[in-house]
From Swiss-Prot:
GO terms for molecular function: deoxyribonuclease V activity; magnesium ion binding; RNA endonuclease activity, producing 5'-phosphomonoesters; single-stranded RNA binding. DNA repair enzyme involved in the repair of deaminated bases. Selectively cleaves double-stranded DNA at the second phosphodiester bond 3' to a deoxyinosine leaving behind the intact lesion on the nicked DNA. Its EC number is 3.1.21.7. The record marks 73 as: Interaction with target DNA. Its cofactor is Mg(2+). It holds the Pfam family Endonuclease_5. GO terms for biological process: DNA repair. InterPro entries: Endonuclease-V (IPR007581). This is Endonuclease V. Coiled coil: none annotated. The keyword Kinase does not apply.
Length: 231
């Protein structure tokens, strides 16, 4: 794997990312969350996309794709490893979201091309990065209170918002992915909260990917609704 080639591709691709609001909706009808993980010791890449109706944030569709991992883990180049599975899950969706939240960084990346920006650009959809750990940049000490907020800065440029979404939890790093400015990114993430650390779209994507209790319960409720239709 030629790191110099990947770095050059990152730099060239980053220039195509749109960092301001570029969407027609005043309120999205459908919001998706995307999450990527690895199975079988990293040999298989698994991507899950959960599609939610807005503003109710009700799960209406999900897709999971598993593909053979074609690239080793290289710090700073994770998006190249993850996007093939994300594209496979995206292609299976029956509906297209108006807005996409990706578990990972957008422009808050050393070369400004995290997975949220890379994937958002590939599918040309307004995209927000919601990361759980800092990748680059610095921020002022954050208050312990829920809602505490600080800009993540790098070389004089704001890359993300550092936001404590839940009391006694580590903050999230919310960044532009593609076609969504920083102010709007924070706004839409805040509107997708329902008392957990993560916004509902990425929380549901994780639940789908990991077959968590919430997702099992949702499946059971759907099965019961199909078996006992309303009179």
């Amino acid at each position: 794997m030629d790191i110099a080639v990947l770095r050059a591709e990152q730099i060239a691709t980053e220039g195509k990312v749109i960092r301001h609001d570029d969407f027609a909706f005043s309120q999205p009808g459908l919001i998706a969350g995307a999450d990527v993980g690895f199975e079988q010791g990293g040999e298989v890449t698994r991507a899950a996309i959960a599609l939610l109706r807005f503003p109710s944030l009700e799960l209406v569709e999900f897709q999971v794709a598993r593909v053979t991992t074609t690239m080793p883990y290289i710090p700073g180049f994770l998006s190249f490893r993850e996007y093939p599975a994300l594209l496979a899950a995206w292609d299976k969706l029956g509906h297209r979201p108006d807005l996409l939240l990706v578990d990972g960084h957008g422009i808050s990346h050393p070369r400004r091309l995290g997975v949220a920006s890379h994937f958002g650009l590939l599918v040309d959809t307004p995209t927000i990065g919601v990361a759980k750990r800092r990748l680059c940049g610095k921020f002022a000490p954050l208050a312990e209170a829920q809602g505490a907020l600080a800009p993540l800065m790098d070389k004089g440029e704001q890359l993300a918002w550092v936001w404590r979404s839940k009391l006694r939890c580590n903050p999230l790093f919310i960044s532009t992915g593609h076609r969504v400015g920083l102010a709007s990114a924070l706004h839409w993430v805040q509107l997708c909260m329902r008392g957990y650390r993560l916004p509902e779209p990425t929380r549901w994507a994780d639940a789908v990917a990991s077959n968590r209790t919430a997702f099992k319960r949702w499946q059971q409720e759907r099965e019961e609704a199909d078996f006992f239709p309303p009179q």
